A protein has these predicted regions:
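Catalytic Walker B motif of ABC-type/P-loop ATPase nucleotide-binding domains
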Residues: 69-72
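A short, surface-exposed alpha-helical micro-motif characterized by mixed small hydrophobic
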Residues: 110-112
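A short, proline-enriched helix->beta-strand linker immediately N-terminal to the Walker B motif
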Residues: 63-67
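Hydrophobic anchor residue at the start of the ABC signature
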Residues: 58
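Conserved ABC ATPase signature
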Residues: 44-48, 52
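Short coil-to-helix segment of the ABC ATPase nucleotide-binding domain corresponding to the Q-loop/switch region
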Residues: 3-11
Length: 153
């Protein structure tokens, strides 16, 4: 809460990776543009919406140049109108070839973006399938029940 958005994104590359501040600042600016927040570079976390904070968190993670991004319910705490902002950034990452593992209940997003769906229940992987197969013809009874409940409600 005491550093600006751009300083927040620069912090780990400078401290952990040893990047020069100027290089880290330039990269952070590019990442903010990538997540649609270049205009918020000098803002502080308290000045951002939940969706903006989540997109800054994505930019901060990308600043470390990871080979894989892990997302655990990235939209669960967001107001409905903010969900699309975050999902659009994640769609862009997928289109750019970023490997992502995402725990989500956003089934439309999973259907559109995933290469593989792993359906889990109580910590166990019950089914692994392509999105087309999973949503059309799930093999496990628990997966069928889950999808049926989604379609009913």
């Amino acid at each position: 809460p005491h550093v600006s958005v751009i300083e927040n994104i620069m912090m780990s590359p400078v401290k952990v990776l040893g990047e020069k501040r100027a290089e880290a600042r330039q990269h952070a600016g590019m990442l903010l543009e990538r997540v649609g927040l270049s205009h918020k570079a000098n803002a502080y976390p308290a000045q951002l919406s939940g969706g903006q904070q989540q997109r800054v968190a994505i930019a901060r993670a990308l600043a470390m140049k990871p080979p894989v991004m892990l997302f655990d319910e990235p939209t669960s705490a967001l107001d409905p109108e903010m969900v699309g902002e975050v999902l659009n950034v994640m769609r862009g990452l997928a289109q750019e070839g970023m490997t992502m593992m995402c725990v989500t209940h956003e089934m439309n997003f999973a259907r559109d973006v995933a290469d593989t769906i792993w359906f889990m229940d109580q910590g166990q992987i019950l089914e692994k399938a392509t999105p087309g197969t999973f949503f059309r013809a799930p093999q496990h009874a628990r997966a069928r029940r889950f999808l049926s409940d989604l379609l009913v409600h």
